[in-house]
Amino acid sequence: MLIIAGLGNPGGKYAGNRHNIGFMAVDAIHRRHSFSPWSKKFRAEIAEGELGGEKVLLIKPQTFMNLSGEAVGEAMRFYKLQPADLVAIYDELDLPAGKARLKTGGGHGGHNGIKSLDAHCGKEYRRLRLGIGHPGIKEMVQNHVLGDFAKADKAWLEPLLDTLADNADMLVRNEDSQLMNKIALALGGKAEEEKPRKDNKTTEKKPAGQSHIHQARNHNQPKVLTTGPMADILKKMFGNKGE
């Protein structure tokens, strides 16, 4: 079983905030796939369904952002799950708008929702960070995060959420790099280059049944001198062996 937790603040007042992009992502997955209607449990809104043949619980904590870990931790204990069974989706100031990054573990980066998850759920869970951009000035961060997305943001926000929802089964299959490439391409970026495969270098095959030493002895042996001054000296020293 996998828990996909979208982080945000509850209530209509915060629904369109940049800080609520985690809620938006989970809502998009819920709409795209066959999940149960939202219900209330664990101080959260939850919905059950399947992705990629595995049972999945979508969860939106209703505790407000700073206490998100209390709700998610309660659900994890109920289902006896480990940090590896959790994916958290949340906003990231330090990523340009529309960029996404997915990794296991790491720091909280000053995100209070992640601080709470770390405290209540452990740290080795997967973190899907969705970039909302930085306003450029520290004093503007709070208004930026708790401000609504602008109309112009729809140009990247909608394809980001749609692509994530369309390929949510990749989260279950741990196809993290493939999912990141899908999102990058949908936003007009470039997929990350795959690591080059090692060339299958052709090596000289050794004859069957022969050791490396035996091969070396039979390979390009120097010619024995039979004539000339050096040959005469060798004959005087060692005699005519082998003749």
UniProtKB/Swiss-Prot annotation:
The record marks 9 as: Discriminates between blocked and unblocked aminoacyl-tRNA. GO terms for molecular function: peptidyl-tRNA hydrolase activity; tRNA binding. Residues 190-207 have a biased composition (Basic and acidic residues). The active site is at residue 19. It comes from the Bacteria. Keywords: Cytoplasm, Hydrolase, RNA-binding, tRNA-binding. One of its GO terms (cellular component) is cytoplasm. Its EC number is 3.1.1.29. One of its GO terms (biological process) is rescue of stalled ribosome. It is found in: Cytoplasm. TRNA binds at residues 14, 64, 66, 112. It catalyses: an N-acyl-L-alpha-aminoacyl-tRNA + H2O = an N-acyl-L-amino acid + a tRNA + H(+). PANTHER family: PEPTIDYL-TRNA HYDROLASE (PTHR17224:SF1). Monomer. Hydrolyzes ribosome-free peptidyl-tRNAs (with 1 or more amino acids incorporated), which drop off the ribosome during protein synthesis, or as a result of ribosome stalling. Catalyzes the release of premature peptidyl moieties from peptidyl-tRNA molecules trapped in stalled 50S ribosomal subunits, and thus maintains levels of free tRNAs and 50S ribosomes. Belongs to the PTH family. This is Peptidyl-tRNA hydrolase. It comes from Rhizobium leguminosarum bv. trifolii (strain WSM2304). The gene is pth.
